[in-house]
Swiss-Prot record:
Tagged with keyword Disulfide bond: yes
Lineage per the UniProt record: Viruses, Monodnaviria, Shotokuvirae, Cossaviricota, Papovaviricetes
Keyword Secreted attached: no
Molecular function as annotated in GO: DNA binding; structural molecule activity
Similarity comment text for this entry: Belongs to the papillomaviridae L2 protein family.
One Pfam family named in its UniProt record: Late_protein_L2
Secretion signal span: none
Name of this protein: Minor capsid protein L2
Main localization, broad class: virion
Post-translational modification: Highly phosphorylated.
InterPro entries: Late_L2 (IPR000784)
Length: 472
């Protein structure tokens, strides 16, 4: 184990130590000689100074200040000393004093003389006061009727540019006769143009017509969501409630409305989730339906907020939650399919016919054949019903089969094959040619050469209902 050395602290200067430790007697041995000038170098200079004069050279153990007189430069003449003289002050103007004016300046102006007081007037009369009484015969009535004044009425008209009241035009009496001529400056003959109308919605289209006036060229492929990346944690959810109510796995709340095809966000809280696999989930992205390993899979990406920094940034892993809805079984395991009859007969006594039976061994239930002519077509007298239990006489119609195109002839109990084929006019077969895949009916366009440069790519697995976050 390597020992760690303590950091070295710088000691105070010798001058500071000498001030505090000289009186206490705790100074280090190198402080007092350095301050008092009793070091070995100082003693050597003192001993050598007894025989050699070194004054004025500034040789010593102190700072290099050149002694009391300073360093004297060698060589060169001395420069004249320049004394800076400041600007001269303006002179003080002294006002002259005349011979008749006093030399003493008075500080307070002269004021008028104030009398000490006026004499008190004297009254002459009898003893006491004289009282005089009087009675008024006129009642004190105040006239409160206001005086008639002049009233001035003024009016001001202000026009508001935001609202101008439309003026009211008084209808005037006009002429009612039949000779009224109206002429305008734009009167004249105007021509018109016939524009042919085109049908935009055609029933004979191929379905590949562009739906906009400027279609986007090329083929745009939507990249499949990378749900099985190494950066995602794979968690399987066995509860089918994950499809309809995914929030029940994150929080204990039961919202009234929860969209199942959108991204769900949750507030980060310290409470424990109902399902431990959904702990610290703050977002569940839109679902995606995929097919993987023979099953239909329902997937959602979840974002966790395991850590939160002081700046507010949340850090967490991305988890892929998936639930297998149903397995996809191959057709080889279910080759035998039992077919149920769509119509059942209520009459079990009706005879059944075998379409592969020999017509010679079938009991004769038909009437003699009718001759066929090209101009007449026999019509049956009664309709033949296999499931009919009514005993009625039936008549079959013989229709000759044409063998010009080498059609296969089938026989059965209800199909009669004639022994001699009628004579039909022979028609030459149409010439067989190999039709190309693309037929060009004109020379006013050409195929885009870039079609031949498109390479086939590997077919990817189909994905549906993925949002932007899942796709990338």
């Amino acid at each position: 184990m390597v020992a760690v050395r303590a950091p070295r602290r710088k000691r105070a200067s010798a001058t500071d130590l000498y001030k505090t430790c000289k009186a206490a007697g705790t100074c280090p041995p190198d402080v007092i000689p350095k301050i008092e000038g009793s070091t070995l170098a100082d003693k050597i200079l003192q001993w050598s100074g007894l025989g050699i004069f070194l004054g004025g050279l500034g040789i010593g153990t102190g700072t290099g200040s050149g002694g009391r007189t300073g360093y004297i430069p060698l060589g060169g003449g001395g420069r004249p000393s320049v004394v800076d003289i400041g600007p001269t002050r303006p002179p003080i103007i002294i006002e002259p004093v005349g011979p008749t004016e006093p030399s003493i300046v008075t500080l307070v102006e002269e004021s008028s003389i104030i009398q000490s007081g006026a004499p008190i007037p004297t009254f002459s009369g009898g003893n006491g006061f004289e009282l005089t009484t009087s009675s008024a015969t006129t009642p004190a009535v105040l006239d409160i009727t206001p005086s008639a004044g002049t009233v001035h009425v003024t009016s001001t008209n202000i026009q508001n540019p935001l609202y101008i009241e439309p003026p009211i035009d008084i209808p005037q009496a006009g002429e009612a006769s039949g000779h009224i001529f109206t002429t305008t400056s734009t009167a004249g003959t105007h021509s018109y143009e016939e524009i042919p109308m085109e049908v935009f919605a055609s029933t004979n289209g191929t379905g590949l017509e562009p739906i906009s006036s400027t279609p986007i060229p090329g083929i745009q492929r939507v990249s499949a969501p990378r749900l099985y990346s190494k950066a995602y944690q794979q968690v399987k959810v066995t509860d089918p409630n994950f499809i309809g109510n995914p929030s029940t796995f994150v929080t204990f709340d039961n919202p009234a409305y929860e969209p199942i095809d959108e991204t769900l966000t949750y507030a980060s809280s310290s409470t424990v989730a109902p399902d431990p696999d959904f702990l610290d989930i703050i977002a569940l992205h839109r679902p995606a339906l995929t097919s993987r390993k023979g099953t239909v899979r329902y997937s959602r990406l979840g974002q966790k907020a395991t850590m939160k920094t002081r700046s507010g940034k949340q850090i967490g892993a991305t988890v892929h939650y998936y639930h297998d809805i149903s397995p996809i079984q191959s057709f080889a395991e279910h080759e035998e399919i039992e077919l149920q009859p769509l119509h059942t007969s209520t009459h079990s006594s009706a005879p059944l016919f075998d379409i592969y039976a020999d017509p010679d061994t079938v009991p004769s239930i038909h009437t003699p054949r009718m001759s066929y002519s090209p101009t007449t077509l026999p019509v049956p007298r009664y309709a033949s019903n296999v499931f009919s239990s009514i005993n009625t006489s039936t008549t079959n119609v013989t229709v000759p089969l044409s063998t010009s195109f080498e059609l296969p002839v089938y026989s059965g109990s209800d199909i009669y094959t004639p022994t001699s084929s009628p004579t039909w006019p022979s028609l030459p077969p149409p010439p067989t040619t190999n039709l190309p895949a693309i037929v060009v009916h004109g020379d006013n366009y050409y195929l885009w050469p870039y079609i031949y440069l498109i390479h086939k790519r590997r077919k990817r697995m189909p994905y549906f209902f993925s949002d932007g976050f899942v796709a990338y």
